[in-house]
Amino acid sequence: MQNDAGEFVDLYVPRKCSASNRIIGAKDHASIQINIAEVDKVTGRFNSQYKTYAICGAIRRMGESDDSILRLAKNDCIVSKNF
């Protein structure tokens, strides 16, 4: 779709579940999006960067959201591998 200036705009951009790679539909009201802050290892302060994870409602219904977020954080080196 184009606006009056000729730029392409989308009304809805679907998200994908970070754990299962499923598309999160517009009517999935059980889905969540969480930002986890990256912390400087020396000072322990927030360094203005974060990782965004989206979890679909199906993963939350199964009770697997905490394990999924922990697995994703380990893969992104936010949490240590031996946690």
Swiss-Prot record:
Q: Which InterPro entries match?
A: Ribosomal_eS21 (IPR001931), Ribosomal_eS21_CS (IPR018279), Ribosomal_eS21_sf (IPR038579)
Q: Pfam families, per this entry? A: Ribosomal_S21e (PF01249)
An example Gene Ontology molecular-function term: structural constituent of ribosome
| Claim: Transcription regulation is one of the keywords in the record | no
Gene Ontology annotations for the cellular component aspect, listed alphabetically: cytosolic small ribosomal subunit; rough endoplasmic reticulum
Its localization reads: Cytoplasm, Cytosol; Cytoplasm; Rough endoplasmic reticulum
Superkingdom to which the source organism belongs: Eukaryota
Quick one: where is this thing mainly located?
cytoplasm
Q: Which GO terms describe its biological process?
A: cytoplasmic translation
User: Keywords assigned by UniProt?
Assistant: Cytoplasm, Endoplasmic reticulum, Ribonucleoprotein, Ribosomal protein
Q: What does this protein do?
A: Component of the small ribosomal subunit. The ribosome is a large ribonucleoprotein complex responsible for the synthesis of proteins in the cell.
Instruction: Tell me how this protein assembles.
Output: Component of the 40S small ribosomal subunit.
Family membership = Belongs to the eukaryotic ribosomal protein eS21 family.
The name of this protein is Small ribosomal subunit protein eS21
Species assigned in the record:
Xenopus tropicalis (Western clawed frog)
